[in-house]
């Protein structure tokens, strides 16, 4: 008797792809296009993390009535994370960045 793995039986036999939404910020914008805007993957990580922190600080200061930081430069999606917003801003060339700062 041979047995088939459970994962194989869960795969649709008609070749249809699984139904799920592609998460934004992880695969969209594409990593290759983001890397073209910086000198290395490490520079991209620092660049995006700094901008995400600024966006997060902007949201946190809204309740205090202080407007020290610049908010999102792209229309944020419902429940979109600051890092995803930062990656979309970088992809859209809305930010200027000097490496080493």
Swiss-Prot record:
InterPro entries: DNA-dir_RNA_pol_omega, Pol_omega/Rpo6/RPB6, RPB6/omega-like_sf. Keywords: DNA-directed RNA polymerase, Nucleotidyltransferase, Transcription, Transferase. Residues 1-13 have a biased composition (Low complexity). It comes from the Bacteria. Residues 1-22 are annotated as: Disordered. The keyword Membrane does not apply. It holds the Pfam family RNA_pol_Rpb6. GO terms for cellular component: DNA-directed RNA polymerase complex. Gene3D superfamilies: 3.90.940.10. GO terms for biological process: DNA-templated transcription. It catalyses: RNA(n) + a ribonucleoside 5'-triphosphate = RNA(n+1) + diphosphate. GO terms for molecular function: DNA binding; DNA-directed RNA polymerase activity. The keyword DNA damage does not apply. Its EC number is 2.7.7.6. Promotes RNA polymerase assembly. Latches the N- and C-terminal regions of the beta' subunit thereby facilitating its interaction with the beta and alpha subunits. Belongs to the RNA polymerase subunit omega family. The RNAP catalytic core consists of 2 alpha, 1 beta, 1 beta' and 1 omega subunit. When a sigma factor is associated with the core the holoenzyme is formed, which can initiate transcription. This is DNA-directed RNA polymerase subunit omega. It comes from Rhodococcus jostii (strain RHA1). The gene is rpoZ.
């Amino acid at each position: 008797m041979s047995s088939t793995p459970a994962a194989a039986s869960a795969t649709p036999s008609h070749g249809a792809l699984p139904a799920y939404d592609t998460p934004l910020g992880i695969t969209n914008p594409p990593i290759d296009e983001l890397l073209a805007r910086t000198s290395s993957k490490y520079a991209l990580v620092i660049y995006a993390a700094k901008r995400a922190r600024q966006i997060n600080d902007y949201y946190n200061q809204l309740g205090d009535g202080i407007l020290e930081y610049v908010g999102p430069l792209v229309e944020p999606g419902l429940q979109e994370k600051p890092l995803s917003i930062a990656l979309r801003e970088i992809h859209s060339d809305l930010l200027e960045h000097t490496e080493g700062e």
